[in-house]
Amino acid sequence: MRRITRIWLYIFAGIFVETSMLAQNPFTYYKGKGYKDIAAYRMEKEIDLNTYTPSVPILYEQSVPEHQSTLSYRIALPPYIRGIFFSRDSRPNDYQWPNNTNRLLPWMFHRLKELTQESYPGIPSNSQPSTLGDALLLQLSNGEYLFAKAVAGDNSLSWFQVNTDGTLTLYISTLGEDKLAGQIPLLLIQRSQSVYDAFNNAYSSLIADPKVSSLKRRIDKEYFETFDYLGWCTWEHYHYDIDETKILNDINAIEASGIPVRYVLIDDGHIANKDRQLTSFTPDKKRFPHGWKRIMNRKRDHKIKWIGLWYSLSGYWLGISANNDFPEEIQQTLHSYNGSLLPGRSTDKIEAFYHYYICTMKEHGFDFLKIDNQAFTLPLYMGDIQVVRQAKDCNLALEHQTYNSGMGLMNCMAQNVVNTDHTQYSAVTRVSIDYKKYDENMAKSHLFQSYTNTLLLGQTVWPDHDMFHSSDTICGSLMARSKAISGGPVYLSDSPNEFVAANIRPLIDESGKIFRPSAPAIPTPESILTNPLLSGKDYRIFAPTGDEAISIICYNLNTSPADKTVKSYIKQEDYFNGKKIENSSLYSSAPDGIIAFDWEKQTAEVLNADKEIKLEGFTDRLFHLCPIRQGWAVIGIQEKFLSPATVQILSRTNDMLILNAHCTGTLKVWVESNGRQELRSIPIKRTGKIEIKK
C-alpha cells in the first residue's frame, strides 16, 4: 500500500511540475533565458522598406488577427552598403534582451548576417552581439540613410531579430497573457540624404505621436541646476563598501582638496534589502546608524550644496521584498508576481507607490536621484498581464513624481524602448557601459559607445558618460576632455586625496560650474559607420561650443598594435557640418575664414587646406574651429578645455570686440587688421564685460 501511495505521489508530482511548466507564459523572464525565434503568428504581408512613405513615419498594423499575443513580419530591406544594429551583447546564462541595462551597443556590419557568426569580432571588452535589437541604421546604395526603430504602444512592444541567413524579422507582442487588439504601432522609419537628418526627423516623428512616446526634445527640457556643476560619486572608489563614516570623511577630504566639488552622489551600498529585494526606504541601519541626518547636515551653499542618492526603479535589483516596512496604504499598491512585489496593477496604484517613493527621498533631504536598473523593470512584469503598460507607467510615474517634487533625475541602465521613449521631463541618461579605471580597451569601447549612442539618445536627453578618475594614469586627461564635450554631468570617483587638479580645473570655473557645449558631441559623418577599435583609422567627434565655434576631438581608439599610429585631419567642412548637429541661426551667415586652435599646443592658424595630425597610441587632440568675422575670431580662455564656452560675444565691429568673460585666465583672440594677423593673449583677472580694440 505504501508503495502504491508513493507511486501515486510521484505521478501526481510529475503532473504538477509538467502543468506548472506548461502554464508558464513563454515570456516569463529569468536569467539565461533568450527570446530568439519566439513563437509568433506570422503575418502574410511583409514590411517593405523600399516603399517608404515620408508622410507615414510610424507604421501601424490596422488588422490584428484575433486571439494573438505575438506577431512577426518579414522586413524587406533596400540595397545597402553597411549599417549599425543597436542591441545589447549576449552572454550564455546571463540576462538577455529586453534587459538592455546600459548595454545598447552599436554593432557595425556590411551584411547583417555577420552579426550571427561566431567570427564576428564585436567590440573589445564585450561578448557577441544579441541578434534581438531596438534600432537599425543603414547607408543605402543610393546614397541615402535609413533609420528604423522599435516602438512601444499602449500595451505592446516591437523588436528586431537578425536571422542567420541575413534577413530581418520584426516582432510585436504584449510580452504576456494579453492579446493584441486595435491599431498596433510597429516601427518608426526615416530616410534622408543626411544621416543627421535621419535621426533628427525620426525623433521629431516619435515625439509628435503620443501613442508611442511621452517625450520632449532635449532643447525643450529644463536641465537640472545641480548637473551644471562638478560632482563626486562613491561607486568606482568604494563600490558597495560605503557607510556613514566613510562618506563624512570623504566630504572632509573633498573640502580640504581645494577642488570645488558641488555635489555628492551616494551610489549603491546603502539599501536595506533581503536577497537583493528592497525592504525599506530607510538605509541599512548597520552602515548608516543615524539615517541620513549627519550627512545632510554637511550641505553648504558654497561648498557641497547638493546630495543625491542611487536607487533602483523597481526597488532594488530584484524588486521589492514581501518583508518590507511600507505603510499599509502603500502595501495595497503592490502585487506579487514571479517572486517579487511590483507596483500596480492600475496606473493610479503605480503613481501612488512612486509618490511615496520620491516623497520619502525628498523628506530625507536629497536633491536628486540616480535611478538605476530601469531596463529590468519590464522583465519583472513579463509573462503577466498588462506587461508593457505597467512597466511604462513605472517610468512615467518616476518622471511625474520627480518633476512635481522638484528633484533632479539621472537615468541609468535605462536603454530599452520603454525607458528611452518616456523621459517626459528628465534630461540626463547614461549612454554606455561603465567606465573602468586603468582599463585601456574598456575606455576605448566606452568612448565609442557613448558618442555613437548619443546619435539616438541625445535627441531627447543629455548623455551621461559616467564618472571618471582624474588620477587614471592611462586616460585621466583624455577622459576629462570627453566628459567636457559630452555636455552631460561631470562627476569624479577618485579618492579625494588623489584628485589631479590639472585634469579637473580645465573643466570648470572657480565655483565648480562646468563649461558645456551647446549640444552633445557626436561622431563626424565619416566616423558614424565605422568601429574605431578595429578600423585602423582615426575617430572624430564634434560639438558646437560657445556662441559660434565647433570643437573637435580626434582619437586613435584602435586596439591592434599595427595601428599604433594613425593620421587624422581638421578641415573647413567640419565647421559647416557643425550646423547639422543642431539647427541654429548662429551659422546662417558664412564667415570670412576659419581659425583652427590647437588646444594642446595653444596655437592657431587660418584653416585653408586640410590640416593633418598624427595620433600616436591611445590619444586625443582637441581643436576649436572659430569663425573669422569683421577681423575677429574669438577662441576664449585658453586654460579651459572648451575655451569658446568661457566667453559670450556681446558685439563686434571692424574696430572693437565686446565680450563677457565667464572666468579668469588668458583670453585668446585672433585679430586681423591692415593685412596683419595676430593671436592675441589677454590676461583676464576678473569676470564680466571686456572691450578689445584692434
Which residues are covered by each model-predicted region?
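Bacterial Sec-dependent N-terminal signal peptides
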Residues: 1-25
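Solvent-exposed beta-hairpin/edge-strand motifs
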Residues: 80-92, 575-601, 670-683
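N-terminal accessory beta-strand-rich subdomains and adjacent acidic, glycine-rich linkers
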Residues: 25-208
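C-terminal beta-strand-rich structural cap/linker in extracellular carbohydrate-active enzymes
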Residues: 607-647, 667, 676-694
